[in-house]
């Protein structure tokens, strides 16, 4: 739900605006003057950028649910072809099917499909850029709803970005947002009866620079650890979950960070 997204107000408003427009798009484009001014490019596209774990996929899921539509994640392996012109044909076929089904398309890691065109150095580059032009035409002809995600906006070809009505960056959560995430997940996921009793440890954990996804999986790991120990989730379990998440990135808590959390328990 929208409540699951912990984002800056401006970003959250942008997502809600996109979802609202998605809900009224049929009514909107029935207006003759709008159809006359926009003979093409009526599709509703959203580019979500941000570091891994900042909630791009979750935002797409929330939007699709709000619209009451299925969310179809497109495997780029089914789109991208080494043969010139085939990628655009594959995309056109997928877009036509999605428009007929009235679904929301999700292009995860869209850089591979909508990346910057290269400087022309040989015939291969010229053909590759021609394929990109065909992709642009396919995008302009699509009248449905689609969401693209990328870790970095600069990876996407500016020509694609100019055709997108909505471009939003999901930042890493600040300390206040992390505190809210820790408290909310401790209550809803870990079933902590008295979140305030864990207030100090949760505040200490909120000082750690983690993404929303890392916090969510750290709490899940704490739930499993507590079940294994046969008791309720404690600050020690949460700290164990943080350790596991950081290990994925080849990181670990510094002694100072560990002392701060331990002192708060």
How does the language model describe each region?
Residues 264-265:
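Accessory N-terminal regulatory regions that flank AAA+/P-loop NTPase motors
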Residues 207-237, 243-251:
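AAA+ ATPase "lid" subdomain C-terminal helix
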Residues 8, 141, 208-211:
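Membrane-interface junctions
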Residues 10-199, 203:
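Walker A/P-loop NTP-binding motif of AAA+ ATPase domains
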Residues 1-6:
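Interdomain "pre-motor" coupling segment immediately N-terminal to P-loop NTPase/helicase cores
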Residues 252-256, 260:
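C-terminal regions of RecA-like/P-loop NTPase motor modules
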């Amino acid at each position: 739900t929208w409540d699951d997204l912990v984002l800056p107000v401006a970003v959250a408003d942008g997502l809600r605006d996109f979802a609202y427009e998605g809900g009224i798009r049929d009514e909107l484009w029935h207006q003759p003057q709008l159809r006359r001014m926009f003979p093409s490019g009526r599709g509703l596209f959203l580019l979500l950028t941000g570091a891994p774990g900042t909630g791009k996929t979750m935002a797409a899921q929330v939007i699709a649910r709000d619209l009451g539509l299925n969310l179809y994640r497109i495997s780029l392996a089914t789109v991208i072809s080494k043969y010139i012109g085939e990628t655009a044909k594959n995309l056109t076929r997928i877009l036509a099917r999605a428009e007929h089904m009235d679904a929301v398309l999700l292009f995860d890691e869209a850089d591979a499909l909508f990346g910057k065109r290269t400087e022309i150095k040989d015939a291969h580059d010229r053909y590759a850029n021609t394929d990109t032009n065909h992709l642009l035409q396919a995008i302009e002809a699509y009248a449905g709803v689609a969401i693209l995600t990328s870790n970095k906006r600069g990876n996407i070809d500016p020509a694609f970005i100019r055709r997108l009505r909505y471009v939003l960056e999901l930042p890493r959560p600040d300390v206040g947002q992390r505190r809210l995430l820790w408290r909310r997940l401790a209550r809803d996921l870990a079933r902590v009866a008295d979140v305030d009793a864990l207030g100090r440890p949760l505040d200490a954990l909120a000082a750690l620079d983690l993404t929303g996804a890392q916090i969510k999986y750290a709490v899940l790991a704490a739930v499993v650890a507590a079940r294994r120990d046969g008791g309720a989730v404690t600050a020690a379990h949460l700290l164990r979950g943080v350790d596991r998440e950081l290990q994925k990135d080849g990181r670990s808590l510094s002694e100072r960070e560990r002392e701060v959390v331990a002192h708060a328990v």
